Amino acid sequence: VEDRARNKMLVELVKKASAGTRQLLVLSDRRFHCEFLHQCFPKTSGLYMGGMKEAQLQESSKKKIIFATFSQAHEGLDIPTLDTVILASPKSDITQSIGRIMRETKGKKNEPHIYDVHDPWSVFTAMYYKRMKIYRQGGFNIHGKNVEEPKSAFPQGKCLFL
């Protein structure tokens, strides 16, 4: 949360992922982290956290970028237009979180993209391997470090970027 280089990387990742027509959900386990990242995108982003009024949540759900806590996304986030999630902080149980972008809706071709930020410290390595197992079981095309890069600028289908 307080790592400047990591936050700079996250800001650049959000810029890159939001350049097209995708609607992003950026998840962190810290409110402060969500608020900090939100300040970098004041016009195009909203917050989705516990303690907010329903009207505020509704307004945020219309934004191109939504910064949310894992706990709020786990409990009551239902935004059918979401198609991209960025996991901004380490977590092992991500099934509910990635499920938010996996829903099929009428008139929308579902090609979910997940950006999983892998923190290399040993305490987070076990979480990373649990997430990778979930992605493989879900049939994701995996792109990133030590993995073949996508052939096109905008990969098709369910994609995971490391």
Model-derived regions, located:
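Conserved interdomain hinge at the start of the Helicase C-terminal
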Residues: 1-29, 35-39
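Hydrophobic anchor at the start of a short beta-strand
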Residues: 24, 43-46, 142
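Conserved RecA-like P-loop NTPase helicase motor core
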Residues: 46, 50-138
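Short hydrophobic alpha-helical runs that function as membrane-insertion/retention elements
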Residues: 86-87, 143-145
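Helix N-cap/beta->alpha junction signal
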Residues: 29-31, 69-70
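Short, active-site-adjacent cap segments at secondary-structure transitions
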Residues: 33-35, 74-75
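Alpha-helical structural signal in soluble globular domains
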Residues: 40-41, 100
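Acidic, low-complexity intrinsically disordered tails
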Residues: 145-162
